[in-house]
Amino acid sequence: MSNATNNTLGSLLPQLEAAANSNSLYGGMVPNLRFNITMIVIWGILLTIHVVQLLMRQYWFSIAFICTGILEVLGFIGRTWSHSNVADMDAFLLNMICLTIAPVFTMGGIYYQLAKLIEVYGHRFSLLPSPMAYSFIFICSDIVSLVVQAVGGGLCGVAVTDGTSTTTGNHVFIAGLAIQVASMAIFLMLWFHFLFRIYISVRWEHINSRPISLSLLKISQTEVDYLYREKFHFLRLEPKRWVFHYFNLAMTVAVLTIFTRCCYRLAELVVGWDGYLITHEWYFIILDALMMAIATVTLTIFHPGFAFKGRSTSIPITPGHVDPETLPHTDDVEDILDTSDSKQFDIEKEEFQASMKYPISTFKQFMSKIANLFSSKKKAKL
């Protein structure tokens, strides 16, 4: 009986110590060591896989997910570190900032895929003036969100170090998350509009009627494929290409899980640093860690490189509401099945360099700010 009591007290000791510590940054909660180490391993594996998947030449998507993987690993290292010292500001900031902004890069990779899907199905399904407008608008929005969140996190860190109020930093951080959530909500509306157009509207067009009936499901994708862009029919119709057939579903799952996670983070900060959500880790495990893991595993299996035949097919993003090959007095933009591997590489390289210029620069600046923040705090201690 005595041994059982001692074991129980021993298991509760970290929680009792944290609750008694007035400097605790988690409101008395101690991050679970086993769970956070497990997440470091899982994200390490996912990060390695996405490095290998760079070979599929979906550069934007893979680099975006690599950035996410790095931030998730760093964030869970911070939570593991916090297990032994819940009052350590460096560990808390590493956890809070990295895990909070990681989805910005995930969504950056996802936004670009909608532009590619519009190219595959046809420009007429785009609600915006150009497929690239989706990427440009939402990636710019994410960059703004990232910068605002980084500034808010930095202000909170400095305030705690100086022993002053974190109210301003917290409000800035919340504003950054609110921008991200609002941007994702608008993207979700545009995403479901696109799905409605390619799955419902084309069937109405095919039967020249607009019934609201389950009978529409009896019309196969093969029957309505003639209403899509002819140039990429080989991507859509090959029967064994299950990765492409379920790619839109995978994208939907990923976006909804990340959106759920971002709403949770926003609510967590609104409630406060010592509120109910941040002091009960199960909310974090289910609504943050699990949501991000589901999204990333889903798009690791249904990788755009597999869906779009990234090693042999180029899908350049072109402007306008009309498919380029249908315009009068114009030649095809390019042969999409190019036998020249070097030409294919050059095309993808140019697209990648153009699209990655600002996000990569922002990511470097952000990581530099984190390093400087930790460095200045350590100097202040000395």
From Swiss-Prot:
GO terms for cellular component: fungal-type vacuole; plasma membrane. It is found in: Cell membrane. GO terms for biological process: lipid transport. Induction: In response to loss of mitochondrial DNA in a transcription factor PDR3-dependent manner. Induced in response to altered glycerophospholipid asymmetry of the plasma membrane in a transcription factor PDR1-dependent manner. Glycans are attached at residues 3, 6. Belongs to the lipid-translocating exporter (LTE) (TC 9.A.26.1) family. Catalyzes the ATP-dependent translocation of sphingoid long-chain bases (LCBs) from the cytoplasmic site toward the extracytoplasmic side of the membrane (flip-flop). Involved in the establishment of the functional lipid asymmetry of the plasma membrane. Regulates intracellular levels of LCBs, sphingolipid precursors that are growth inhibitory at increased levels. This is Sphingoid long-chain base transporter RSB1. It comes from Saccharomyces cerevisiae (strain RM11-1a). The lineage of its organism: Eukaryota, Fungi, Dikarya, Ascomycota, Saccharomycotina. The gene is RSB1.
